[in-house]
Amino acid sequence: ERETAQSFDTMCEDIYSGRLDYGIIPISNGRDGRLPVFYELINRYELKIVLACSVGADEGEKTLFALAGKSIPYPEMPFGEPTSLELFVTPGGGQSLTEMFRAAETCGMELQRIDSFGFSSVGEGVTFSPVFSAEGAEIGTFLLYMTAVFPQYTPIGIYRMIR
């Protein structure tokens, strides 16, 4: 397992440095849910999710794999119309996650899930990672809102989900 983690770390570093355009990493599975060690790599190497695919296993469990790159090709979206938007958000200064959820709903998005992480590189407090369904939504408008109201946010994925 340690060798596998080092291999993923090397791959992510290669994407960050430009030696690779993309890499595939697991981001969640049916047994453990979100996989924090891989989100730590996404955070550390400032990677972006550009495509996701759910793959079934023999036992019926599914693993979600992400195609990760250095940037989000928005609004061009060469991998198809986006169906999901994923962020890292560290609220502060009286900001409310409820306000963010209302803005997302106004822009045509729906919260699918939210997790929290304690990334040391982001600073004080907890970083939340909401995933919104974004098919047909006003993603650009929502990101403009986030820039104005939540300066401590990072889009980590605008992607199409392949099932």
Indicate where each model-derived feature is located.
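Domain-level signature for soluble enzymes in the chorismate/prephenate branch of the shikimate pathway
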Residues: 1-163
